[in-house]
Swiss-Prot record:
Main location: nucleus
Native species: Mus musculus (Mouse)
Assembly description: Component of the MSL histone acetyltransferase complex at least composed of the KAT8/MOF, MSL1/hampin, MSL2 and MSL3. Interacts (via the MRG domain) with MSL1 and KAT8/MOF.
Protein name: MSL complex subunit 3
Record's compositionally biased regions (Low complexity): 320-332
Domain Tudor-knot: 13-72
Gene Ontology annotations for the cellular component aspect, listed alphabetically: MSL complex; nucleus
Length: 525
C-alpha cells in the first residue's frame, strides 16, 4: 500500500535508520535497521499515522516488524551516541541481574553491545550500574524503570494466561470415572427398554421419591459410621500418630460430607432432569406433572393440626420408610396415640405425601417393636416394609415410653447395637436420625414441588451416567474430587444393596395408566 498524498513522512523506503524493538519486553536498545515499506495505519484512537516496516540488520526476515514513527530515529552521530549509551546501560543491568545470556538471545543485540569500545565499557560500568533510570533512556518513553515495570506487568499477565490455559487443558484431559455396580447397569438397560421399546412410563409421583431415598441414605450412612467408630481406636492405632487431631474423621465416614453430597445430588437432579435425564417419550409427562394445575396447595389449618399432632408424639422419627400402613388396627390403650393423618384423606391426596413425609410410619414401627401387637398387625408390618427399613429397624431399637431413642451406653454383655455412639451427646444422635434434607415449609404452598419430590430412583440413577461429564466442567481439587467420588461409590452400593426396594418392576405402567394417575390434582406436602 503506497503512502497517500498530503501526509508527511520523516522516513522513506530503503533508508538506513536506528530503531527500538517495538516489543516492550525486549532489551531497550537501538538496533541498526532499514525501512522496507511505508503505509498509513491507525492508532488506538482511530487517527491515521505513518507506519514503517522495519528490517533489523543481521536478523532473520521473520523478525521484521511494523513500527510507529516514534520508535524510529535517523542514523546520525547524536543518535549513535544514544545507541552506545543505551548499550552500556544494558550491559550494566544484565551484569547486575546475572542473566546476560538469557537477556541477549535475539540476533542483533550482541552486535550492538559489542560495538562499544572495551575501554569505554570498563570506564563507565560502575557509573552505569549506579545511574538512575531517567539518565539511561530519558529521551524515550520515561526511562528504564518505567520500562521494567511495564515488562513485569506483561510477563505477569502472560504467566497468568499460561496457567489458565494449562488449568483448562488439565480439566479437559482429566477423566472422571464413576463405577456403577452391575446390578444397576442392568437396571439402566431395563429402564431404557421399558421406556423406548415397550412405551411404558414411571408412575408419578413415585411412592418413594428422591428426597426419601437421600434422607434414608444419610441415616443409613450415619448408623454405619457410628458402628465403625468404636472399632477405629482398636484397629487403627497408627492413624492417631498420622493425624494429631483425635477428632479426625476420614472423608468416607464424615456425616457432614455425606449430607453435602446428597444435597448436591438433589440440586443437580432438579436442574438437569428436563435437560438431559428424560427420554423424548417422557417429556409430555414431565410437563404435566410439573404444571401448577397438577398440585393443590394445602390449607394452613391442616398443616397446623398435623404439626401439633407430631409434637405430641413421643417417638422421634428414626427412619423414613415409604410403605403404607394399615389403618384398621388401633394402637393399644396404654400407648400414646400416633397421628392418623391419612385416614380421612382420599387416595389421590396420599400418593405424594407418602413419598415426602412419613415419620408417622416410623413412630408406629418403633412402638410395635417394643409393645405387644396383634399377630395380624405384626405380619402385615413385616410384609409391607422394604428390606432397607427392616434392616435399619433391627439396628435402631427404641424403648417405648422413653424419651431417649437409643441406648447411649453399651450393655454388660457387649450386645448393644449402638456401641458406636458411645460417648456422644444424645442431641447429636437425635439430630442425625431426625435430619431432613429440606425444611418443612419447602416448597411453598403456591408453587409446584421440584422434580426430586416427584421422581424416584429410576431417574436418579440416570444422573450418575451424566455426572462424569458434569463434574469434568467443574473446578475441583484432586483431594475434594477423590472424597466426592468415594461418597458416590458408597451411595451406589446402597442403591445396589436395596435394589429390589428402590427399583420395583411395578413402577413402570402403561402410558394410559400413567396419564390417569396424573389426571386429578395432588396436594403439596
Amino acid at each position: 500500500m503506497s503512502a497517500s498524498e498530503g501526509m508527511k513522512f520523516q522516513f522513506h523506503s530503503g533508508e538506513k535508520v536506528l530503531c527500538f524493538e517495538p516489543d516492550p519486553t525486549k532489551a531497550r536498545v537501538l538496533y541498526d535497521a532499514k525501512i522496507i515499506d511505508v503505509i498509513i495505519g491507525k492508532d488506538e484512537k482511530g487517527r491515521k499515522i505513518p507506519e514503517y516496516l522495519i528490517h533489523f540488520n543481521g536478523w532473520n526476515r521473520s523478525w521484521d516488524r511494523w513500527a510507529a514513527e516514534e520508535h524510529v530515529l535517523h542514523d546520525t552521530d547524536e543518535n549513535r551516541r544514544l545507541q552506545r549509551k543505551l548499550a552500556k546501560k544494558a550491559i550494566a543491568r544484565l551484569r547486575g541481574t546475572g542473566k546476560k545470556k538469557r537477556r541477549c538471545r535475539l540476533p542483533g543485540v550482541d552486535s550492538v553491545l559489542k560495538s562499544v569500545p572495551v575501554k569505554e565499557k570498563s570506564k563507565n560500568d560502575e557509573n552505569s550500574v549506579s545511574s538512575t533510570c531517567h539518565e539511561s533512556c530519558g529521551e524515550k518513553n520515561g526511562g528504564i524503570k518505567e520500562h521494567r515495570q511495564r515488562r513485569i506487568k506483561v510477563k505477569a499477565k502472560a504467566k497468568k494466561k499460561v496457567l489458565s490455559l494449562r488449568s483448562r487443558k488439565e480439566m479437559d484431559e482429566r477423566t472422571i470415572t464413576i463405577d456403577i455396580p452391575d446390578v444397576l447397569k442392568k437396571q439402566l438397560e431395563d429402564d431404557c427398554y421399558y421406556i423406548n421399546r415397550r412405551k411404558r412410563l414411571v408412575k408419578l409421583p413415585c411412592q418413594t421419591n428422591i428426597i426419601t431415598i437421600l434422607e434414608s441414605y444419610v441415616k443409613h450412612f450415619a448408623i454405619n459410621a457410628a458402628f465403625s467408630a468404636n472399632e477405629r481406636p482398636r484397629h487403627h492405632h497408627a492413624m492417631m500418630h498420622t493425624h494429631m487431631n483425635v477428632h479426625y474423621v476420614p472423608a468416607e465416614k464424615n456425616v457432614d460430607l455425606c449430607k453435602e453430597m446428597v444435597d448436591g445430588l438433589r440440586i443437580t437432579f432438579d436442574y438437569t432432569l428436563p435437560l438431559v435425564l428424560l427420554y423424548p417419550y417422557e417429556q409430555t409427562q414431565y410437563k404435566r406433572v410439573t404444571s401448577s394445575k397438577f398440585f393443590l396447595p394445602i390449607k394452613e389449618s391442616t398443616t397446623t393440626t398435623n404439626r401439633s399432632q407430631e409434637e405430641l408424639s413421643p417417638s422421634p422419627p428414626l427412619l423414613n420408610p415409604s410403605t403404607p400402613q394399615s389403618t384398621e388396627s388401633q394402637p393399644p390403650t396404654g400407648e400414646p396415640a400416633t397421628p392418623k393423618r391419612r385416614k380421612a384423606e382420599p387416595e389421590a391426596l396420599q400418593s405424594l405425601r407418602r413419598s415426602t413425609r412419613h415419620s408417622t410410619n416410623c413412630d408406629r414401627l418403633s412402638e410395635s417393636s417394643s409393645s405387644p401387637q396383634p399377630k395380624r398387625r405384626q405380619q402385615d408390618t413385616s410384609a409391607s416394609m422394604p428390606k432397607l427399613f427392616l434392616h435399619l429397624e433391627k439396628k435402631t431399637p427404641v424403648h417405648s415410653r422413653s424419651s431417649s431413642p437409643i441406648p447411649l451406653t453399651p450393655s454388660k454383655d457387649g450386645s448393644a447395637v449402638f456401641a458406636g455412639f458411645e460417648g456422644r451427646r444424645p442431641n447429636e444422635i437425635n439430630e442425625v436420625l431426625s435430619w431432613k434434607l429440606v425444611p418443612d415449609n419447602y416448597p411453598p404452598g403456591d408453587q409446584p414441588p421440584p422434580p426430586s419430590y416427584i421422581y424416584g430412583a429410576q431417574h436418579l440413577l440416570r444422573l450418575f451416567v451424566k455426572l462424569p461429564e458434569i463434574l469434568g466442567k467443574m473446578s475441583f481439587s484432586e483431594k475434594n474430587l477423590k472424597a466426592l467420588l468415594k461418597h458416590f461409590d458408597l451411595f451406589l452400593r446402597f442403591l445396589a444393596e436395596y435394589h429390589d426396594d428402590f427399583f420395583p418392576e411395578s413402577a413402570y405402567v402403561a402410558a394410559c395408566e400413567a396419564h390417569y394417575s396424573t389426571k386429578n390434582p395432588r396436594a403439596i406436602y
